[in-house]
Curated annotation (Swiss-Prot):
It comes from Campylobacter curvus (strain 525.92). The keyword Nucleotide-binding applies. This is GTPase Obg. One of its GO terms (cellular component) is cytoplasm. It is found in: Cytoplasm.
Length: 376
């Protein structure tokens, strides 16, 4: 089961008490104090691990606690430190205060390790309290208390490309065509009920991670449909690929305006990310050239005919709008491309174009054969 949010009460370990003890040896009549210190309580760590994919391990658990430190003992023996509590979480996990929603930790990298709560310090044994006026102290410190915090763990998937579209627009079909992901595919809305990640190999040396997010409907930013539960998963994506259905009863303009509006309402910052547009089901569309031409005109791209790729003999190729990557205007889509996952039309061009945009992007890619550049 895909679990992307859990509430927990986390506690470190209580420090062990110091010991009150005196030397008791043969021929030593008045042995001095020899009480050892208490052991420190265990700490709480958060560790990001790529082998962890959901927060399901913590479902149904309300409280997790590190081990308490053991008490000290005679002969100046220090108590054993409490065992640490280590929470293994997927990269992309954010930790919030359950009451205030304050972000407390954000684990985005493999093997990232965060000390979240420090264990209580062990108390000092009575050996520390001997003085010239008190040769036999019968006092030792108690260990310091543990730290406790009510938290909410939220997983936000990390991907290079996030697919944004209405239900049943072909996102699952595309990701299964271009990557190793195998999502459930059927001809009804909300086939994808959990986000899926797929590794897209563009060539022998490079590729990227694509996220298939459950379909957005109008009002998603207000919680309708699958709503906010999954919109958050596109927050960490480097670029957005809006997918519009050429064979849908809604116009391309209506689809794009609605999707763009929902993303903007959810996060104005997210709406500023580099983006591109894929027009799906070109094999089933009527009046393909007219629909694409009208949509480009609506986007203010009709005067950019020099950016339309025209290659004879390849159906649909002459309908691809694409910017010059070195003169990229990020207020416009990098490309508008009709595709068909069913017939593989323009799929190769789509993969290479997305990789081009990622390599010119502002962020480092998760998976690539070469170091990526940053746009100046």
């Amino acid at each position: 089961m895909f679990i992307d949010s859990v509430n927990l009460t986390l506690s470190s370990g209580h420090g062990g008490a110091g010991a009150v003890s005196f030397r008791r040896e043969k021929h030593v009549i008045l042995g001095g104090p020899d009480g050892g210190d208490g052991g420190d309580g265990g700490d709480v760590y958060l560790i990001a691990d790529n082998n962890s994919h959901t927060l399901a391990a913590y479902k149904g658990k309300r409280a997790l606690k590190a081990q308490n430190g053991e008490a000290g003992s005679g002969r100046r023996m220090t108590g054993k430190k409490g065992e640490n509590l280590e929470l293994i979480v997927p990269p992309g996990t954010a930790v919030y205060d359950a009451q205030t929603n304050e972000l407390l930790a954000d684990l985005t990298k493999e093997s990232e390790r965060v000390l979240f709560l420090k264990g209580g310090k062990g108390g000092l044994g009575n050996v520390h309290f001997k003085s010239s006026i008190n040769q036999a102290p019968e006092y030792a410190q108690k260990g310091l208390p543990e730290e406790t915090r009510d938290v909410r763990l939220e997983l936000k998937l990390i991907a290079d490309v996030g697919l944004v579209g209405f239900p049943n627009v072909g996102k699952s079909t595309l990701i299964s065509t271009v990557s190793n992901a195998k999502p459930q595919i059927a001809n009804y809305e909300f086939t994808t009920l959990t986000p899926k990640l797929g590794l897209v190999e563009v060539d022998e040396y490079s590729g990227f991670v694509m996220a298939d997010i459950p379909g957005i409907i109008e009002g998603a930013s207000d919680g309708r449909g699958l709503g906010l539960k999954f919109l958050k998963h596109i927050e960490r994506t480097k670029i957005l690929l809006y997918m519009l259905d050429l064979a849908n009863h809604r116009s391309l303009k209506e689809q794009f305006v609605t999707l763009r509006g929902e993303v903007e309402k959810f996060s104005p910052e997210l709406a500023k990310r580099d983006f591109a547009i894929a027009l799906t089901r070109m094999d089933a569309a009527e009046n393909l050239e007219r629909k694409v031409g009208e949509f480009l005109q609506i986007l203010g791209l009709s005067g950019e005919r020099s950016n339309l790729i025209d290659e004879a003999g390849k159906a649909g190729k002459n309908l691809i709008y694409k910017q010059d990557i070195y003169e990229f205007d990020d207020s416009k889509p990098y490309f508008v491309m009709p595709i068909s996952s069913a017939t593989n039309q323009n799929i190769t061009e789509l993969k290479f174009s997305l990789l081009e945009l990622l390599k010119k992007g502002k962020f480092q890619m998760i998976f690539a054969g070469n170091l990526t550049e940053t746009r100046g």
